[in-house]
C-alpha cells in the first residue's frame, strides 16, 4: 500500500486473510495523522530527483504501526491478548531479523543507503515497540489521563498538512509537550539506538 497526500493505493492478494487486510488498511488510515498531517520540511515538498530524508521514520511508520494495532484492540476487532501477542511478535522479529542496534534517526536520514535499506523494515517492528513505550511513559506520568494519541493531536494542531516542522525541533517539542522522561527515552533508544530492556 502507498499513501499520498490526497489518496491511498492498496493492492492485495486474493489469498490475504481478513486480519492481515485489517492490519494494512488500519496502518494506511493512520498515515493521515503522520506523515500526511505531521511531517518535517524534509518531506513536505519531496523532491524525487534530489531526495532529502527526515530523521523521523520512527514516528511516520513506527507510531502509525502502533496505532494500527492499538486501534484494533480499542475497537474490539482483536482482544487485549491478541494485541499483546502482536507486540510480542514484533519484539521477537526485531531481535531475530535486525539484531544490530542502530540509531533510528540515523537510519532514517540515511535510508536511501543500501545498508540502511536492509534494516528499514524494522520501523514496523521495533518502531511500533518504541511508540508503545512512549505511550506507556505518557500514560504512567499522567496517571492514565493522556497517551501518545494526545501527543499526536497536539503535534497535529501545532503543525498540520501545510505547516511542516524542522527535523531538529521535533524531539525538543515532544519533550516540552509531554515529560522529560519521554525526551530521555527518545534520546536513549531512538537517537542513540541503545538496546531496550522490555522487562
Task: Go through each PLM region and give its residues.
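Juxtacatalytic substrate-recognition/specificity segment
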Residues: 1-56
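Soluble non-cytosolic domains of exported or imported proteins
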Residues: 19-20, 24, 54, 58, ...
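Long, well-ordered core segments of solenoidal/helical folds
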Residues: 34, 88-98, 151-161
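Acidic/His/Gly-enriched intrinsically disordered linker/tail segments
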Residues: 39-46, 51-127
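Terminal peptide-recognition signature
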Residues: 64, 144, 186
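Structural helix-adjacent loops and short alpha-helical linkers that scaffold large soluble proteins
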Residues: 72-84, 139-146, 178-183
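Alpha-helical scaffold elements that line and support the substrate/ligand-binding pocket
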Residues: 127-139
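Beta/coil-rich, acidic/histidine-enriched accessory regions frequently appended to metallopeptidases
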Residues: 158-199
Amino acid at each position: 500500500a502507498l499513501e499520498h497526500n490526497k489518496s491511498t493505493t492498496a493492492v492485495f492478494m486474493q489469498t490475504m486473510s481478513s486480519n492481515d487486510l485489517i492490519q494494512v488498511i488500519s496502518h494506511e488510515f493512520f498515515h493521515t495523522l503522520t506523515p500526511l498531517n505531521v511531517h518535517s520540511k524534509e518531506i513536505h515538498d519531496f523532491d524525487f530527483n534530489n531526495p532529502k530524508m527526515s530523521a523521523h521514520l520512527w514516528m511516520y511508520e513506527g507510531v502509525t504501526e502502533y496505532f494500527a494495532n492499538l486501534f484494533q484492540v480499542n475497537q474490539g476487532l482483536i482482544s487485549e491478548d491478541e494485541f499483546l501477542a502482536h507486540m510480542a511478535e514484533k519484539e521477537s522479529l526485531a531481535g531475530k531479523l535486525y539484531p544490530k542496534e542502530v540509531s533510528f534517526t540515523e537510519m532514517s536520514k540515511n535510508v536511501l543507503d543500501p545498508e540502511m535499506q536492509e534494516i528499514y523494515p524494522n520501523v514496523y517492528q521495533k518502531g511500533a515497540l518504541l511508540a508503545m513505550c512512549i505511550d506507556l511513559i505518557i500514560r504512567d506520568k499522567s496517571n492514565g489521563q493522556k497517551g501518545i494519541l494526545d501527543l499526536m493531536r497536539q503535534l497535529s494542531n501545532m503543525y498540520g498538512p501545510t505547516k511542516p516542522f524542522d527535523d531538529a525541533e521535533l524531539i525538543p517539542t515532544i519533550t516540552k509537550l509531554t515529560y522529560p522522561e519521554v525526551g530521555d527515552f527518545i534520546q536513549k533508544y531512538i537517537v542513540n539506538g541503545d538496546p531496550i530492556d522490555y522487562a
